[in-house]
Amino acid sequence: MAIKNEYLLDLLERTKKRNPGEPEFIQAVTEVFTSLEPVVEKRQDLIDAGVLERIVEPERQIIFRVPWVDDNGKMHVNRGFRVQFNSAIGPYKGGIRLHPSVYLGIIKLFLNTCSKPKNLIMPR
């Protein structure tokens, strides 16, 4: 099902431009927007308050290096990531991701579509 709402289409295009090279994240945002379209059509207040803009844009993205020495004495440097989306309901949740196959788009996808809804319903 294609998105028809002009506001959602515009926001999706802006999200694509701000997150190039992150196809998994863009796919997840597209799916979320598709499912939220009926709600957005009925709730102008969500648009006025910029709720969806805040959903797709993290408050902070931290990328850092992690130097380490393997068992053979060889030095390696990996990247670590921490993405923090919204502190409105309390302290950030979620950990730091260090696996070599991970990149920023995957972290944003996981945190935005999996952890955030869980964190909204779980007691702190």
What are these regions (language model features)?
Residues 1-124:
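N-terminal ligand-binding/catalytic initiation module
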